[in-house]
């Protein structure tokens, strides 16, 4: 995804004000969500994968709040992706809009041969 595509996706989110089976929205205004594992495994276990957009507050009428620190959140997303089995390799994109910074993580769907993708800390059956 390019920065322009992320900006288009932000506009789409403002129009629809909803998530979909391949789109998850996280505020991340004050820090990176600490447990992305369910979302990461859910998207990795779908053929088409999915996208997580950070910087939109779903609980506040989809307010565009931006992220606290684009460099740090990318590192923390990657750290959580490395705790998955198989390791999730997100495509990260950063875009600016209205003086705020937004980050998206595209999570590719895993091949059937390596599924299920799961959180290593919980194990194959519960992660």
What residue spans do the PLM features occupy?
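Conserved N-terminal catalytic/coupling substructures associated with nucleotide/phosphate chemistry
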Residues: 1-127
């Amino acid at each position: 995804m390019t920065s322009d595509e992320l900006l288009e996706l932000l506009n789409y989110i403002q129009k629809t004000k909803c998530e979909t089976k391949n789109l998850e929205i996280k505020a991340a205004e004050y820090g990176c969500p600490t447990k992305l594992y369910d979302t990461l495994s859910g998207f990795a276990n779908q053929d088409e994968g999915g996208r997580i957009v950070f910087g939109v507050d779903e609980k506040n009428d989809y307010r565009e709040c931006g992220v606290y620190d684009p460099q740090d959140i990318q590192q923390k997303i990657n750290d959580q992706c490395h705790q998955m089995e198989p390791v999730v390799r997100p495509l990260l994109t950063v875009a600016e809009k209205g003086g705020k910074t937004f980050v998206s993580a595209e999570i590719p769907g895993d091949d059937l041969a390596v599924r299920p993708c799961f959180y290593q800390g919980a194990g194959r059956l519960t992660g």
